[in-house]
Amino acid sequence: MEWLKQAAKACYSQLVRFVSRRAVRDKLSKEIVYLMSFPSNNQGLIEALRRDYPVTVMYTSDCRKEAEALAKQQVSILPLDNPFVFFWQCVPLMTRSRVVICDNYFPFLGYLQKHSDAVFVQIWHATGAIKTFGYEDRQLKHRTKKDLARFTSVYQSFDYYVVASKQMADVFQRSYGAREEQMLYFGLPRTDQFVQLRKAQTEQQDQTADHKKVIVYTPTYREGQTELPLLDIPKMAKELGDSYRLIVRLHPHVQKLADKVPHTPFVSWDGHLQPTAQLLETADLLITDYSSVVFDYTLLKQRASVIYFWYDREQYEEKTGLQPHLTELLNGPV
């Protein structure tokens, strides 16, 4: 069936090229397109932009609720996962727009016929990076030359990267082949909320003496994952149940694995229902593995308590890869 998959990719790429080549002849508009694949990542950026410019949010299925909330504020939205809408509305609009803002890697950008005066900006979906990606992804050695060329065409579509640190700028330069002059050291809009919440916590502590401490567990996504993470929750409940409660937030791609898992007085599996900032604000302790959410938590909490649960470190490092010198930067035990 591999030939069928390759044929589908070829048809997809040719159709994107065909539609965008026709649209690129049109006059460039003042439209700003925001490509959204991560919820709770824009934090007011879209609302601020729409005060002065027409903005259209193109979203993946994981962001449907957030997109619909924006639509109620009179923001134009288009689903990327609807083939008809994608080819006949999204692609032409992206091609004609002066600015395209991206929060992730979007494969179709490599096929898009880009207007010479258009600007594509990568704002990413994380403050920092723990695992490797792009050219540093361990799986790259198993990909074909055609795949590598396709990845490169996507990386080269970005004109600028919004970053909050030199470390993250270095990551993009290694992972996407970006250049230093493409880095915009503005800080990320998504992190403002954590700084504001941190100030509020300092000014007002609302915990009571009988407050049960909250552990938040945020495992990252693993390719092909079909089972829940290996955290020994029954043992935790036995040892900690009197003083703690556990909230699990799975990656959106695997949340369905927990749909039929019962909640107990100790553990709940509905962390995905809360915005990231709100969930982390409640946490007295964060347990994670390779998730970049730890950077958000560190910004939010003055005394951030973190445990890194790397039960599959060797396999993960071999399959995906971890950032160099990572262990020197960790703020908690492994």
PLM features: residue spans?
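Conserved catalytic-core segment of nucleotide-activated headgroup transferases in glycan assembly
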Residues: N41-Y53, R174-S175, M183-K260
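Catalytic binding pocket for nucleotide-activated donors in carbohydrate/polymer assembly enzymes
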Residues: L285, S292-V334
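Donor nucleotide-activated moiety binding/catalytic core segment of transferases
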Residues: D81-M94, P252-F295
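Catalytic donor nucleotide-activated moiety binding site of glycosyltransferases and closely related
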Residues: M58-Q73, L240-D270
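Active-site-proximal region of nucleotide-activated glycan assembly enzymes
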Residues: I77, H115-D192
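A short beta-strand/loop micro-motif in the catalytic core of glycosyltransferases
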Residues: V100-I101, D159-S165, I247, L286-I287
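N-terminal pre-catalytic "stem/leader" segment of glycosyltransferase-like enzymes
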Residues: M1-Q89, V99
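Short N-terminal targeting/anchoring amphipathic segment
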Residues: Y34-L35, P92-F108
